[in-house]
């Protein structure tokens, strides 16, 4: 699905494990069930958020500048995106994509997974969402595929997407369009510097 970069900050796709195509991602040493590195969020604050339902057969897009929500918690900076996904359909695969916009900025996502009781069950830091080069139908983006096995009896999971002050101090090196074109047509790769995208709170 092609989406306009100026309108999309985050795209979340939920589906059954077998239905999601493989994506090459850099190896990241992490244990998703270890939530100790995630910000501590009071239950009352989580309950005040509006959780957008995600249909596993569709892509859910959120423009953080206009559709993000505020969560005033230490360790979280800027607007957040909050989704709910069905947990009673077996093993889940969530693909989160954050596209680089025309101003060469990008939202570096962190993802906290909560069970139906709003208890943290998995955490994916921003380092998990790696840079993916543009393709025919895709833009420069940060992307990560999260595979989850909900506990028996769970009806839904909650997915909280946010960025941090530490992430805002970092950048992502992109592939220069001329290099991407040369690579695509089989020409020699020009020796030119790659653009650098700064990290922002809203991806716009």
Regions found by a protein language model. Give the residues of each.
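Gram-negative bacterial Sec-dependent N-terminal signal peptides
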Residues: 1-25
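Noncatalytic modules at the cell exterior or secretory-pathway interfaces
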Residues: 90-94, 147-173
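Solvent-exposed serine/threonine-rich low-complexity stretches and specific carbohydrate-binding patches
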Residues: 123-134
């Amino acid at each position: 699905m092609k989406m306009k970069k100026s309108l999309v900050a985050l795209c979340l796709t939920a589906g059954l494990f077998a239905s999601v195509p493989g994506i090459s991602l850099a190896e990241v040493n992490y244990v998703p069930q270890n939530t100790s590195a995630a910000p501590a969020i009071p239950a009352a604050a989580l309950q005040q958020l509006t959780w957008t339902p995600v249909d596993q057969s569709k892509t859910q897009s959120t423009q953080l500048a206009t559709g993000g929500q505020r969560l005033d918690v230490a360790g979280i900076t800027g607007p957040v995106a909050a989704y709910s996904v069905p947990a009673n359909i077996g093993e889940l695969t969530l693909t989160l994509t954050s596209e680089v916009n025309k101003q060469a900025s990008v939202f570096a996502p962190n993802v906290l997974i909560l069970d139906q009781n709003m208890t943290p069950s998995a955490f994916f830091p921003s380092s998990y969402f790696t840079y993916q080069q543009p393709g025919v139908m895709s833009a420069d983006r940060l992307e990560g595929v999260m595979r989850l096995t909900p506990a028996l009896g769970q009806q839904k999971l909650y997915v909280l997407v946010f960025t941090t002050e530490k992430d805002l101090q970092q950048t992502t090196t992109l592939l220069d369009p001329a290099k991407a074109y040369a690579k695509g047509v089989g020409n020699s790769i020009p020796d030119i510097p790659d653009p650098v995208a700064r990290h922002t709170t809203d991806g716009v």
